């Protein structure tokens, strides 16, 4: 049985290669901590990770049963999260707390990638009459951090904060194609069935070969209907200053008579926008945009003033 993608935050620590470069399961890098050495901080975040759209409220007893810790330990962790504002009591249950709303607002206003991307995404939406998404890689999750949407596009809204399938769709495939080989091998060991089901290959060599083709091409176009009926997507990678993959610029369009041939799609505009975003983010990382720092400080002063 394959492990669920959303719970695979430590996959890369348990695979490696032998001297002949063959895939070996169960090997940990020497720099990794022992499997049993789980810190209290990790366990606190294990509690926070229980909360989802499927189950937004948890009692102490439910969390204790799910995490298999003592009730007193789980209660102590919940109390810590409540004190930090990350959880809040709802009757005898607990849900996400107001501090998360505050942090989300802070990210919307100050996230460097989001700030440089918003004008370009809005321009692309108007030019292409399409939904434009800014996707961010987070461990083994890919999350929408901004969406430019218009109901006239005919594409359902995705929504900020929504995660996408890790092995399906243009976004996931273009991001996977730029992950380090070691991480891809770990993913394959743990998700071979899901990878085959997504059409990415029924062997490690096939999986690696398919992703190599995407990487060489520099973009990926999904099949119509792969994730949404009548919709196809174009995704181009976004990189940090050291050329590590951090996410993608993704465009969703309804078919409505459009061809899925790459020479008839707005690839040039999407690739240019993604390239510009990578350059802008690299400039921010290298400290070349001091004006953004000044703007953030000004914004902080404004937000600190009472209403």
Question: Model-flagged regions — what are they?
Answer:
Residues 98-190:
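Amphipathic alpha-helical effector-binding/dimerization core
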Residues 232-236:
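Short hydrophobic beta-strand micro-motif common in sensory/regulatory domains
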Residues 2-110, 114, 275, 279, ...:
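N-terminal helix-turn-helix
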Residues 2-14, 18, 154-229:
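Short, solvent-exposed recognition segments
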Residues 206, 217, 229-231, 245-307:
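Juxtadomain coupling helices with adjacent low-complexity linkers
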Residues 238-241:
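Sensor-regulatory modules in signal-transduction proteins
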Residues 50, 66, 116-127, 133, ...:
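Amphipathic alpha-helical regulatory segments at dimerization interfaces
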């Amino acid at each position: 049985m394959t492990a669920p993608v959303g719970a695979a935050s430590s996959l890369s620590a348990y695979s490696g290669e032998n001297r002949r470069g063959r895939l070996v399961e169960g090997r940990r890098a020497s720099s990794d901590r022992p499997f049993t050495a789980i810190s209290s901080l990790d366990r606190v975040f294990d509690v926070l990770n229980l909360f989802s759209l499927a189950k937004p409220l948890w009692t102490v007893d439910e969390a204790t049963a799910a995490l298999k810790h003592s009730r007193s330990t789980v209660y102590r962790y919940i109390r810590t999260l409540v004190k930090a504002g990350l959880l809040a009591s709802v009757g005898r249950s607990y849900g996400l707390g107001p501090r998360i709303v505050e942090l989300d607002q802070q990210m919307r206003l100050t996230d460097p990638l989001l700030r440089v991307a918003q004008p370009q995404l809005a321009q692309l939406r108007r030019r292409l009459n399409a939904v434009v998404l800014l996707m961010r890689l987070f461990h083994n999750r890919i999350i929408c951090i901004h969406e430019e949407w218009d109901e006239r596009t005919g594409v359902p809204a995705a929504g900020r904060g929504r995660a996408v399938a890790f092995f399906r769709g243009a976004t996931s495939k273009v991001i996977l194609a730029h992950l380090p080989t070691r991480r891809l091998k770990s993913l394959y060991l743990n998700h071979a069935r899901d990878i085959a089901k997504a059409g990415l290959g029924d062997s490690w060599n096939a999986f690696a070969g398919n992703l190599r083709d995407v990487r060489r091409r520099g973009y990926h176009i999904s099949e119509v209907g792969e994730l949404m009926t009548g919709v196809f997507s174009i995704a181009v990678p976004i990189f940090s200053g050291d050329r590590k993959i951090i996410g993608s610029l993704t465009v969703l369009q309804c078919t409505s008579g459009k061809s899925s041939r790459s020479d008839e799609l707005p690839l040039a505009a999407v690739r240019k926008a993604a390239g510009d975003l990578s350059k802008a983010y690299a400039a921010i990382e290298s400290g070349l945009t001091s004006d953004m720092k000044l703007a953030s400080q000004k914004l902080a002063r404004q937000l600190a003033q009472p209403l």
